Design a protein with these regions (language model features):
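Function-determining sites in protein domains
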Residues: 2-138
Length: 138
């Protein structure tokens, strides 16, 4: 009788541990290192007088001081996996009105990409996650 109870309890405990590990906060600082190059695009999206617009600003030449400030900012923010993250293809429909794209390169090779939206969605390397302070991050 004890063996019959022990097996389901072990399965439930194992499942709970896996859920805790899967849904734990992940740090944005893992996407870039000090020796990587970065490029960023900030976009503001909206409708004015019935016409849709996208105002974008490219940040191509980021100085060392700016990169250090970006790295310390990335260190302060976290994101979380969702149930849909496992099956996502990087698409998101709820953009909000601001987006920030960060591209991280090692020499000329793109190694990581981050697409943050003001709605709280963040796409990292073609997987969709949730980010609580996304608008403040942008």
């Amino acid at each position: 009788m004890k063996k019959k109870m022990l097996c389901p309890i072990v399965i439930v405990i194992t499942f709970l541990i896996c859920c805790i590990v899967y849904f734990k906060p992940l740090s944005l600082s893992d996407v870039a290192e000090a020796d990587n190059q970065m490029k960023m695009i900030y976009s503001q999206i909206g409708v004015e007088n019935g016409e849709a617009y996208i105002d974008s600003v490219n940040y191509q030449d980021i100085t060392i001081d700016q990169k250090n400030a970006i790295l310390s900012l990335l260190d302060k923010y976290t994101y979380r996996r969702t149930v849909g993250t496992l099956f996502s293809n990087g698409s998101t429909s709820d953009l909000g009105n601001k987006t920030l794209s960060i591209y991280v390169y090692d020499d000329d090779l793109l190694i990581n990409s981050v697409f943050a939206t003001s709605s709280g969605k963040v796409v990292i390397n073609e997987k969709t996650y949730n980010m609580e302070d996304a608008e403040r991050f942008i």
